[in-house]
A protein has these predicted regions:
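Bacterial Sec-dependent N-terminal signal peptides
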Residues: 1-34, 529
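Long, intrinsically disordered, low-complexity segments
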Residues: 109-112, 200-202, 291-343, 418, ...
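Short coil/linker segments at helix-helix boundaries
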Residues: 130-145, 172-191, 246-266
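Short edge-strand/loop segments of extracellular domains
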Residues: 179-183, 273, 451-461, 671-689
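GH16 jelly-roll
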Residues: 293, 388, 511, 524-704
Length: 704
C-alpha cells in the first residue's frame, strides 16, 4: 500500500467557487411559484405521500453506489474491484480522507433526518375533509387517516435509520428530533455519550414499531415501506453493534471508557428474538434464488428495489459473457466456505487443493463464479490466459467473478432492461445470527445458539454444528457463518470493525488464485489497513500520511534529465511532438533554465520574440520562427534509462507554478498517458489570451 506524494501543484479555485456561488444565488432567488410550497405539500394527501417516498429514496442500495459500479465488500478482505479508478479503491490504499470519502453519507443522512422530521411535524395537517364530509365514503376517510398515522411511524423509523448509519460510521452524534432552524444558534449542541445516542435511536425504533403494521396493510403499492419488523430489526442491529467491542470501548465525552457489560449483549439478544418471534417471517427455501429479485420473500424484512436495468449484470458478468467483471471475490472469502461435511477447507489437503470447488458449501456456487462454473450453457474460464482470465481486458484480478444478485438469463450485449434486483437491508437470517452471537456472549451454551445457527446452515444443506463447543470456538463459528451467509450485503466491513479484528482481516494480504494448465497457487496483493475503525467527518483539510517520492524537484544548477525531458532537446522522446502544436512558437531547450531566488530553486521557462532568429543547431528545433518558448515533461522516457519511467497506480501530484499574464502567452499543465498523448491527455490547466489584437480584454482560463 505505498502511497505516493509528488510535489507539484496548487491551482486557484476562484472560478470554481464563483460558479458555485452564482448557482446557489440563482436557486435561492427563484420565484415562489416555481416550486410547491411546504404548506401546499402537507395539505395534499397525494403530495404528502410523494414527500415520504423522497425520504425513502435517500436510503442507499449497495449495488453500484461507488464509482464504476463498486460494492462495499470490495473495500474488505472479501473482494477487490477490478477497476483501479473506482473510488472504492481509496479504502484499499488508505487514501480516503475527511474531504474525499467514497462512503460520505454524512450529508445524505442529515438530509434524511431533516426531511423525516419535517414530515413528522406536518403530516397531521393533511386535509381529508372531502372524505370526512362524504357520508358515502367514511371507510376511505378512516383508511386515509390510518395512512397518516402509519406514515408518521415510517418517518420515525427512517429518522432512526439515518441516525444509526451515522453512529456506525462516526460514533455517537447528537440525536436530532426536530427541524433545526437555520438562523438559530446551535453552538451549545454537544456530542452525546455512546449510551445516550444508542438509547435515543432504540427509543425511536420502539415508538415507530408501536404504530407500524406487521405487513403493508393497504395494498401492494406500499411494498418496500417500513413495517413493525423493520423497526425491530433496526433495533436488533443497533443493540448488537452497541454491545460489540468497538462500541463498548468507545470513550465517553469525559474520556472514560464504557465498561464491558453482559447486559448489553442480553438486550441485543432480546431485540433479535423479538423479530424472530414475528410469525410471518421464515427462511426462504433456497439461498441462491433468494437474491434473484425476490422482493416478496418471507425472509425479507426490509429491502430496497433496484431498477430493472441490466446495469448490474453488465458491470459484473465475466468478460467473455459481455460483462466488465467489476467486483471480484477474493480467495480469502472462498477459503471461508466449508466443505459439505462441515470441515474446513485446506490447501494443505492435496485432494482438496486439486479440486478446490468440489464438495463445498453450496453458498459458494451461489455467490461467485469460479473456474469451471456454468453460465448460459457454457463454462466460465478464469485460467490466466483463458477467455475470462486475468490477462484478458477487463479480466478478473482474483480468479473469481460475482454471481450473487445477477440475473443469469440476461444478455448484456443486447438487453437494456433486466429483471429487477432486490437489495436486502434486513432479512431473517441476519436476525438468527444476531441472536446467536448475542446469546453466545452473555449466556454461552444456551440451547438457542445452536438452534438458530444451525437453521441458517441447514438451509444451505450444511450439517448442524454439534453441541459442546467452547465460547471461543462458537464465536468463530458464528463469525464464519455471518461472513458466508451475508457476503456482499455490506456486513463484512462493519463486522470486522465492531469486533476489532481489522488488523487481522482488512490489514491482511488480499488473495487471488493463479490458474495455469499444470498448477494452482495463491497470489497476494495488498488490501486496506485495519487500523481505522470509524470514518472521518467531512472537512477541508489536506490529509497527512503520504509517502514522499522525490526526484522531480528543481534543485541544483541544471535540469536533471533523468527526471525531466525538455521539448526541443533531441535526447527527449517527445522532442518532435509539440514543436509548434499549431502555434507560432518553437520549443527550444535554451528557453528553460534553473533559477534560485529567496532560497528557493525553480525552473524558469522564458517566452520571447526575436525579430531575426538564428537557425537552431538542434535538429529537433530548427524552424525559423520568431516566437521561442519551452516545455518540460516529468519522468519522460528518454535515452538516459529506465529510471525515467514512473507510472504510479495512485498518487497525489502537486505543482507550484507562477503563471505569467501577457498577450500571446499560453501556460498549460497536462497529465498524459505513458503510451502517448493521443491515448489519453488530461488538461489540468490552460491559460492563454485569444484574439488579443481585436479583443484585448478577452482571455480564457480552462481548468479540468
Amino acid at each position: 500500500m505505498k502511497k505516493h506524494y509528488r510535489n507539484y501543484f496548487i491551482i486557484s479555485k476562484f472560478l470554481v467557487l464563483g460558479l458555485a456561488f452564482s448557482s446557489c444565488s440563482d436557486f435561492l432567488n427563484r420565484e415562489t411559484d416555481s416550486y410547491v410550497s411546504k404548506e401546499k405539500t402537507f395539505s395534499s394527501y397525494e403530495l404528502t405521500a410523494k414527500n415520504l417516498v423522497s425520504v425513502y429514496e435517500l436510503i442507499p442500495d449497495g449495488f453500484m453506489r461507488f464509482s464504476e459500479g463498486g460494492m462495499f465488500d470490495a473495500a474488505t478482505d472479501d473482494a477487490e474491484h477490478r477497476i483501479d479508478g473506482s473510488n472504492i479503491q481509496l479504502f484499499n490504499i488508505g487514501s480516503w480522507t475527511d474531504n474525499n470519502n467514497p462512503d460520505d453519507i454524512w450529508n445524505r443522512c442529515y438530509t434524511g433526518i431533516r426531511l423525516a422530521s419535517e414530515f413528522i411535524d406536518n403530516v397531521d395537517k393533511v386535509n381529508l375533509d372531502k372524505y370526512k364530509l362524504d357520508p358515502n365514503n367514511t371507510t376511505e376517510y378512516e383508511n386515509r387517516l390510518k395512512d397518516l398515522k402509519v406514515w408518521k411511524a415510517e418517518a420515525r423509523f427512517l429518522r432512526a435509520y439515518f441516525h444509526f448509519e451515522l453512529l456506525k460510521r462516526f460514533g455517537p452524534t447528537p440525536y436530532v428530533s426536530s427541524v433545526l432552524a437555520l438562523e438559530a444558534n446551535h453552538s451549545d449542541v454537544k456530542r452525546p455519550s455512546m449510551d445516550d445516542c444508542v438509547n435515543a435511536i432504540a427509543n425511536e425504533c420502539d415508538a415507530a414499531a408501536k404504530d407500524l403494521e406487521l405487513t403493508p396493510w393497504r395494498d401492494e403499492s406500499a411494498l418496500g415501506h417500513a413495517t413493525k419488523g423493520a423497526a425491530l430489526a433496526l433495533k436488533s442491529r443497533l443493540l448488537l453493534y452497541a454491545a460489540s467491542p468497538l462500541y463498548v470501548q468507545w470513550q465517553n465525552t469525559d474520556e472514560s471508557n464504557l465498561p464491558s457489560s453482559p447486559a448489553k449483549w442480553e438486550k441485543a439478544a432480546k431485540a433479535a428474538k423479538a423479530v424472530i418471534d414475528i410469525t410471518q417471517y421464515s427462511l426462504h427455501p433456497s439461498y441462491s434464488s433468494l437474491f434473484k429479485n425476490n422482493f416478496k420473500s418471507s425472509e425479507m424484512i426490509f429491502a430496497k428495489r433496484y431498477n430493472n436495468s441490466a446495469d448490474l449484470e453488465k458491470r459484473n458478468f465475466p468478460v467473455s459473457f459481455g460483462g466488465q467483471g467489476g467486483t471480484n471475490p477474493s480467495q480469502n472469502l472462498v477459503d471461508a466456505y466449508e466443505m459439505k461435511d462441515g470441515s474446513l477447507f485446506s490447501w494443505a489437503n492435496a485432494q482438496q487443493a486439486a479440486e478446490p470447488y468440489k464438495d463445498r458449501d453450496e453458498r459458494l456456487n451461489a455467490t461467485l463464479f469460479y473456474n469451471g462454473s456454468n453460465l448460459k450453457n457454457a463454462k466460465v474460464e478464469t485460467a490466466t490466459d483463458a477467455k475470462d482470465g486475468v490477462n484478458k481486458p477487463n479480466g478478473t484480478k482474483t480468479g473469481y467473478y460475482l454471481r450473487k444478485y445477477l440475473n443469469e438469463d440476461v444478455n448484456v450485449l443486447t438487453a437494456s432492461n433486466g429483471l429487477g434486483h432486490t437489495w436486502p437491508i434486513f432479512r431473517l437470517a441476519e436476525m438468527y445470527l444476531n441472536y446467536a452471537e448475542a446469546l453466545n456472549e452473555y449466556n454461552p451454551g444456551h440451547a438457542d445458539i445452536l438452534t438458530y445457527l444451525n437453521a441458517v446452515r441447514q438451509r444451505a444443506h450444511q450439517p448442524a454444528l454439534a453441541a459442546g463447543l467452547s465460547q471461543e470456538a462458537m464465536r468463530e463459528a458464528i463469525r464464519r457463518e455471518r461472513r458466508v451467509e451475508l457476503a456482499f450485503e455490506e456486513h463484512r466491513a462493519w463486522d470486522v470493525r465492531r469486533w476489532k479484528i481489522g488488523s487481522k482481516t482488512l490489514g491482511s494480504d488480499l488473495q487471488g488464485l493463479d490458474i495455469t494448465a499444470t498448477q494452482t497457487g495463491g497470489s497476494g496483493s495488498s488490501s486496506t489497513s485495519g487500523s481505522t475503525t470509524t470514518e472521518t467527518i467531512p472537512a477541508s483539510e489536506i490529509p497527512a500520511g503520504w509517502y514522499y517520492y522525490d526526484g522531480d524537484e528543481f534543485n541544483g544548477s541544471s535540469i536533471d534529465h533523468h527526471y525531466w525531458g525538455i521539448l526541443g532537446d533531441s535526447r527527449t522522446k517527445n522532442a518532435q511532438y509539440g514543436q509548434q502544436q499549431g502555434m507560432v512558437q518553437t520549443y527550444r531547450e535554451e528557453q528553460v533554465s534553473m533559477v534560485k531566488e529567496n532560497g528557493l530553486s525553480f525552473a524558469r521557462i522564458t517566452a520571447t520574440r526575436n525579430g531575426n532568429p538564428p537557425k537552431s543547431t538542434n535538429k529537433d528545433a530548427s524552424k525559423k520562427e520568431p516566437w521561442w518558448s519551452g516545455g518540460l515533461i516529468s519522468r519522460e522516457t528518454s535515452k538516459y534509462g529506465n529510471e525515467a519511467k514512473y507510472y504510479p497506480l495512485y498518487s497525489r501530484i502537486e505543482i507550484r507554478a507562477k503563471i505569467p499574464w501577457n498577450y500571446g502567452v499560453w501556460m498549460s499543465s497536462w497529465l498524459r498517458h505513458h503510451l502517448g498523448y493521443d491515448v489519453c491527455e488530461l488538461d489540468i490547466q490552460e491559460f492563454f489570451v485569444k484574439e488579443f489584437e481585436n479583443y484585448p480584454q478577452k482571455y480564457k482560463v480552462s481548468q479540468t
